[in-house]
Amino acid sequence: MQINLNDVKIEPSWKEVLKDEFLSENFARIKENFLKAKSAGVVYPPSGLIFNAFNLTPFHDVKVVILGQDPYHGANQAMGLSFSVPSGVRVPPSLVNIYKEIYADLGIKEPNSGDLTKWAKQGVLLLNSTLSVSAGAANSHASFGWQGFTDAVIRKISENLQNVVFMLWGNPAKAKAPLIDASKHLILEAAHPSPLARGAFFGCRHFSKANIYLAKHGKTPIEWDLNTKI
């Protein structure tokens, strides 16, 4: 059953760009699966934050894409932005390692908060491949159809924008590289920042590389320092 576009609550530029996706059979299936999961138990992030990454970073503002897998599945963690948690919530291990790399790369002191909203507002699309999860069950919504939707997001950015930096960390993210036109965008690949990768993420210097690339192409670099206000 086709979705009514008026029912999709997402930033207008994304609604236009992704119109065909929202009207597809795949998205109808996502909605059906999501509603079933929601009726069966707690789902993260809260419904109003599912499209938070898109609402904070309009389509034509996208400069950097940081691809995650699925939302955090613990209480009060997921906020619709890959790797991000609300202020006051303990910073997860992968994000701790991201902060360590930013310090090593740019000398920026590690912040106390795990809230990455400031990055999103500057054009960093913090995109998970799967946009929902059941409480306590990692990857539980991996078969819902979200991957087809977020693959389309990556393709739309690649096709319609210029000089975007894609940060692909870990094998699932690296598998998305064929969706991106490397002749007009920068693809940066590294191990996942998770402690399970045994430190292989460190030394990638993706944050300085992104800013050098953006500046070279006439774009304002990202202020990665979360200790200062925008």
From Swiss-Prot:
The EC class name is: hydrolase
> What's an example Gene Ontology biological process for this entry?
base-excision repair, AP site formation via deaminated base removal
InterPro entries, alphabetically?
A: UDG_fam1 (IPR002043), Ura-DNA_Glyclase_AS (IPR018085), Uracil-DNA_glycosylase-like (IPR005122), Uracil-DNA_glycosylase-like_sf (IPR036895)
Q: Which residues form a coiled coil?
A: none
Give the EC number.
Answer: 3.2.2.27
Query: What's a single GO CC term here?
Result: cytoplasm
Which UniProt keyword terms apply here?
Answer: Cytoplasm, DNA damage, DNA repair, Hydrolase
| Pfam families associated with the record | UDG (PF03167)
- Gene Ontology molecular function: any one: uracil DNA N-glycosylase activity
Tell me what reaction this enzyme catalyses.
Hydrolyzes single-stranded DNA or mismatched double-stranded DNA and polynucleotides, releasing free uracil
Functional note: Excises uracil residues from the DNA which can arise as a result of misincorporation of dUMP residues by DNA polymerase or due to deamination of cytosine.
Write down the PANTHER family for this protein, in alphabetical order. Answer: URACIL-DNA GLYCOSYLASE
Which family does the record assign?
Answer: Belongs to the uracil-DNA glycosylase (UDG) superfamily. UNG family.
Name under which the protein is recorded: Uracil-DNA glycosylase
| Source organism per UniProt | Campylobacter concisus (strain 13826)
Q: List the top taxonomic levels of the source.
A: Bacteria, Pseudomonadati, Campylobacterota, Epsilonproteobacteria, Campylobacterales
